[in-house]
């Protein structure tokens, strides 16, 4: 009788132990399934890898922001494009003070020619390259029919326009160029303007007045090496270093000053 009771107690203990093991195994399986779902939602990245990736993105943004801030720190106040260096224009926002900004390249939006970089101009709100068509000689229109001179029996020069290509008209030679017009020498421009290089062309540009940025000629004949020339200062002015205590970093900037 006692042996029978002992066998029953041992079988009950075994059943209880088996039940406990089954419950623990089911809990472990569910926890593993949850962990796998979390990993799949992260795209296979561990929490440490995700943290490193976010830290790298933050560092990249911080580097870009510091670079942008450096460029903005180089700008200085202005009131017109003439006060800015070559390759910059005076940007006047609706809110805030005006400052010299880097010129805009071709196919960039613009509102005026001064915003575009040298050798480009603003056309329909877009910076486009300056074509060489403005330098081509005037080609007279051909009538299609040629009439003989009644007195001599020869063709008139007006009808044979193709024989006069490249010969400037006398009326056109007396017209003085305005700002932006093509020229060969300063005498081709109106008073107060000079003929200066604008990349591969030469156009009429205004003579510089007091306070405007100028180019100091260090060597004789170096004017011809400039791609984007400025006119000389007006009479009674000289191109000197701009000395201003508020802008010590711009000590090398030259402006037209009284002699």
UniProtKB/Swiss-Prot annotation:
Its main location: secreted. GO terms for molecular function: co-receptor binding; receptor antagonist activity. Residues 183-256 are annotated as: DKK-type Cys-2. It is found in: Secreted. Glycans are attached at residue 52. The keyword Secreted applies. GO terms for biological process: negative regulation of canonical Wnt signaling pathway; positive regulation of canonical Wnt signaling pathway; Wnt signaling pathway. May be proteolytically processed by a furin-like protease. One of its GO terms (cellular component) is extracellular space. Disulfide bonds join 183-195, 189-204, 194-231, 214-239, 233-256. Expressed in heart, brain, skeletal muscle and lung. It holds the Pfam family DIKK1-2-4_C-subdom2. Keywords: Developmental protein, Disulfide bond, Glycoprotein, Secreted, Signal, Wnt signaling pathway. InterPro entries: Dickkopf_N, DIKK1/2/4_C-subdom1, DIKK1/2/4_C-subdom2, DKK1-4, Dkk2_Cys1, Dkk2_Cys2. Residues 78-127 are annotated as: DKK-type Cys-1. Residues 1-33 form the signal peptide. Interacts with LRP5 and LRP6. Belongs to the dickkopf family. The C-terminal cysteine-rich domain mediates interaction with LRP5 and LRP6. Antagonizes canonical Wnt signaling by inhibiting LRP5/6 interaction with Wnt and by forming a ternary complex with the transmembrane protein KREMEN that promotes internalization of LRP5/6. DKKs play an important role in vertebrate development, where they locally inhibit Wnt regulated processes such as antero-posterior axial patterning, limb development, somitogenesis and eye formation. In the adult, Dkks are implicated in bone formation and bone disease, cancer and Alzheimer disease. This is Dickkopf-related protein 2. It comes from Homo sapiens.
């Amino acid at each position: 009788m006692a042996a029978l009771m002992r066998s029953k107690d041992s079988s009950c203990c075994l059943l209880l132990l088996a039940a406990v093991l089954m419950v623990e195994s089911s809990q472990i399986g569910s926890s593993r399934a949850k962990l796998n779902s979390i990993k799949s939602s992260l795209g296979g990245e561990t929490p440490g890898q995700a943290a490193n990736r976010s830290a790298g993105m933050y560092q990249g943004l911080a580097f870009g922001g510091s670079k942008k801030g450096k460029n903005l720190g180089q700008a200085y106040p202005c009131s017109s494009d003439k006060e800015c260096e070559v390759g910059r224009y005076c940007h006047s926002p609706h809110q805030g003070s005006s400052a010299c900004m880097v010129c805009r390249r071709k196919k960039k939006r613009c509102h005026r020619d001064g915003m575009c970089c040298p050798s480009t101009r603003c056309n329909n709100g877009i910076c486009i390259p300056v074509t060489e068509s403005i330098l081509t000689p005037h080609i007279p229109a051909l009538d299609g029919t040629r009439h003989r001179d009644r007195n001599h029996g020869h063709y008139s020069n007006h009808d044979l326009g193709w024989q006069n290509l490249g010969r400037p008209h006398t009326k056109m030679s007396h017209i003085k160029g305005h700002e932006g017009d093509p020229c060969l020498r300063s005498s081709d421009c109106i008073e107060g303007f000079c003929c200066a290089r604008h990349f591969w062309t030469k156009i009429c540009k205004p003579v510089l007045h007091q306070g405007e940025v100028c180019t100091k000629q260090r060597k004789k004949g170096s004017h011809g090496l400039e791609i984007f020339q400025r006119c000389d200062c007006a009479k009674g002015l000289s191109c000197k270093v701009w000395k201003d205590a508020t802008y010590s970093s711009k000590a090398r900037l030259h402006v037209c000053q009284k002699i």
